[in-house]
Design a protein with these regions (language model features):
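NTP-binding/hydrolysis catalytic cores, primarily Walker-type P-loop NTPases
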Residues: 87-157
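Phosphate-binding/switch region of NTP-binding enzymes
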Residues: 63-96
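Switch/coupling sub-region of P-loop NTPases
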Residues: 1-68, 76-77
């Protein structure tokens, strides 16, 4: 029996999505990649992949994957061929079971032009909102030093 600090799933392409969410919901830190079109659609994609292994309702699987992966980082290759983190989102599960999708950071494109045969794209990352109280609690319970969390929250102001 192993007790890894971090589980890395190179890319979720099939039923390994179910195993990844199981590991994440049992206290392991799981890092993985998946192809999707946005932060929010990433959860629906995980549900689809999990269903390749188990016949579980979409709603149950959505509950499992949003609990397992509260933070999604969405990156995309833009027309200038550079990859950018476009959005970082938290899925907060509310006490009534509903979900609140919170955009934490967003990449704002401030210039997008064609120069000859090259695209020129400039932008900047913008903090949209802070993390939820429940995620702060989860970070602290899982070992994030309080000083680090306070310092990070200070950057939110």
């Amino acid at each position: 029996r192993f007790n890894p600090d971090i589980v890395c799933v190179g890319e979720m392409r099939s039923s390994e999505a179910y195993s990844a969410q199981e590991a994440a919901r049992t206290g392991h830190t799981v890092l993985t990649t998946i192809h999707s079109n946005s932060c929010e659609s990433t959860y629906r994609r995980m549900v689809t992949l999990c269903k390749r292994k188990y016949d579980i309702s979409d709603e149950t699987l959505m509950s499992l994957v949003t609990e397992a992966f509260p933070i999604i980082v969405f990156s995309k290759q833009l027309e200038d061929r550079k990859r950018k983190v476009m959005e970082i989102m938290e899925c907060e599960i509310l006490p009534d079971g509903n979900r609140n999708y919170r955009t934490l950071y967003h990449y704002n494109i401030v210039e997008n032009r064609l120069e000859g045969d090259r695209f020129i794209i400039h932008g900047e990352h913008e903090r949209v909102q802070g993390i939820s109280e429940s995620l702060k609690k989860r970070f602290l319970e899982n070992g994030m030093p309080k000083e680090q969390l306070v310092r990070w929250e200070g950057e939110e102001a």
